[in-house]
Swiss-Prot record:
The complex is composed of six subunits: RnfA, RnfB, RnfC, RnfD, RnfE and RnfG. It holds the Pfam family Complex1_51K. GO terms for biological process: electron transport chain. [4Fe-4S] cluster 2 binds at C400, C429, C432, C435. One of its GO terms (molecular function) is electron transfer activity. Keywords: 4Fe-4S, Cell inner membrane, Cell membrane, Electron transport, Iron, Iron-sulfur, Membrane, Metal-binding, Repeat, Translocase, Transport. Binds 2 [4Fe-4S] clusters per subunit. [4Fe-4S] cluster 1 binds at C390, C393, C396, C439. Coiled coil: none annotated. Its main location: membrane. Its cofactor is [4Fe-4S] cluster. This is Ion-translocating oxidoreductase complex subunit C.
Length: 505
């Protein structure tokens, strides 16, 4: 039955978008109960609850930070909430302790589905949840943009919509170059309502975060974009910006993947970001609404990023919930709170389309996680298919909202042909997952693309290092040659002077 729906979805998707609302109607006709494309409660008042603290936190840290000696704690150290565990390193932001307690251990671990090594700092909670001394900034207009950006950097804030790019780095590149700020509150992926809940509960704080960004970037136009289905969130924001001239509130259709930054810019401004360029080159900067909220907390409250709002969804056995959870909370703790059986469930980190399936329940909540789905093992049809050979049906090409050729990218990514994948613009892939959903051969296309992107970035970094050290070597060689030539000239001049003296004598 699901196979038949997959073929129907090819015709549902036309050129640019996958119409989720129509797709859900098709699913309801065929009565597929265990499909993951589920209805959002976008017209309901979303409540926000706080998750109780676990006994142990598992805070994941990029292994590059350890290699550069940026770790600030050792085994046995006592820490407070908000205390720096690791210093920032290039585009990698600082990591802070999610609670007060003691460092039990620091271990290296390979995260299989992320295909990367991480250091895990294990923090044992003392139950008191004591903060470090915080220094809120009430009048941020007395500070320069550079100082505020530096504070955001040390507060550990990054893109909370999934990109994970350093917020401060993005701000540094944008100062003096952009004229419009876009606050992205479009959650087009089914089941994910964390941003919707954040707006309904913290609209004033979000507006304050926008004002901070206006001061840093020195811009006069700000667009807050909301999906047309989020009626309550739109009305709440409308009341908050009613007397603010620089703010404009817009609605967009709930068509996946309209929440993607590249696609949203195309919808709002009818512009496409050129190959190898960024939105900043068009005079536009975009931030997720959760990132804006985190900026407000960092500047006005003096709180680094130690928690975030995520959506928990488990279909029949767990109604949709939005919870405020600490970074580093193990998923096993969430399952224990809501009495979910680990033996009968799988965990999907992220939404139903772009999420990653994991099997280790000790995996912890990351800063970039906005949704955790609990999927029944018996009814999980989406992950029970085996990968088969590509039949070149071109369903993925018809479905791609970025007008790429996923079929060609698949072949070249599979054989690690980096030159060809770059020619076919793999960097423009927004990883929406539509091509994977419509593929009749059940090929995990996103896995191939993510791995290829990572290999390309590693290769580029290696080439950069080679060129850098080659230039340093050439400069050193030039300095030595200059030094030798100066020595020779000195010896020759001394010899000539000595001969002249002897001749006079």
């Amino acid at each position: 039955m699901y196979k038949f729906i997959k073929y129907i979805s090819i015709y549902i998707k036309k050129l640019f978008f996958l119409n989720i609302s129509f797709f859900k109607k098709v699913i309801s006709i065929f009565q597929v109960d265990n499909i993951l494309f589920l209805k959002k409660s976008s017209q309901e008042l979303l409540k926000l609850s706080r998750v109780t603290l676990p006994k142990k936190f598992f805070v994941l840290i990029n292994s590059e930070v350890l290699n550069r000696g940026k770790l600030c704690v050792r085994k046995g150290d006592l820490v407070l909430r908000g205390q720096t565990l690791t210093l920032g390193c290039g585009n990698i932001v600082s990591i802070h302790s999610p609670t007060s307690g003691r460092i039990i251990d620091v271990i290296n671990n390979y995260i299989f589905f992320l295909d990367q090594f991480f250091a895990v700092v294990i923090v044992e909670s003392d139950g008191r949840d004591l903060w470090i001394s915080r220094t809120p900034i009430c009048n941020y207009t007395q500070f320069s943009s550079k100082k505020l950006i530096n504070l955001i950097y040390h507060s550990g804030i990054l893109g909370l919509s999934g990109s994970g790019f350093s917020t401060s780095k993005k701000l540094q590149c944008a100062v003096g170059k952009v004229h419009t700020l876009v606050v992205n509150a479009v959650e087009s992926e089914p089941c994910v309502t964390s941003d919707d809940c954040l707006i309904q509960n913290f609209s004033k704080e979000i507006i304050d975060g926008c004002k901070i960004l206006i001061w840093i970037l020195k811009i006069k136009k700000i667009l807050i974009v909301v999906s047309e289905e989020k009626i309550i969130a739109f009305n709440v924001l409308k009341k908050s910006v009613i007397n603010l001239k620089d703010f404009e509130l817009l609605k967009v259709k709930n068509k996946y993947p309209s929440g993607s930054s590249k696609k949203l810019i195309q919808i709002l401004f009818n512009k496409e970001i050129p190959q190898g360029k960024h939105a900043i080159d068009l005079g536009i900067i975009m931030y997720n609404v959760a990132t804006v909220f985190a900026i407000k907390k960092a500047i006005l409250d003096g709180e680094p990023l130690t928690e975030r709002v995520i959506t928990l969804y488990g279909d029949k056995f767990l109604p949709s919930k939005n919870v405020l959870v600490r970074i580093g909370t193990p998923i096993s703790h969430l399952m224990k709170i809501y009495k979910l059986n680990e033996k009968t469930l799988k965990v999907n980190i992220g939404g139903p389309i772009t999420g990653l399936l994991i099997r280790n329940f000790n995996f912890s909540v990351l800063k970039t996680n906005n949704c955790i789905m609990f999927v029944s093992i018996q009814n999980n049809e989406l992950n029970n298919f085996e990968e088969k050979n590509c039949i070149r049906c071109a369903a993925c090409s018809y479905s791609c909202p970025m007008n790429l050729l996923p079929e060609q990218l698949y072949w070249y990514s599979k054989h690690s042909n980096h030159e060809k994948t770059q020619i076919y613009n793999i960097q423009d892939c927004i990883e929406c997952g539509i091509c994977e959903q419509v593929c009749p051969s059940d090929i995990p296309l996103m896995s191939y693309y993510r791995r290829e992107k990572k290999q390309i970035s590693i290769a580029k970094f290696k080439n950069y290092q080679i060129k850098k050290f080659k230039n340093l070597f050439l400069l050193r060689k030039q300095r030595l040659n200059n030094l030798n030539s100066r020595k020779k000239n000195t010896i020759v001049s001394q010899y000539i002077a000595l001969n002249k003296f002897n001749f006079k004598v």
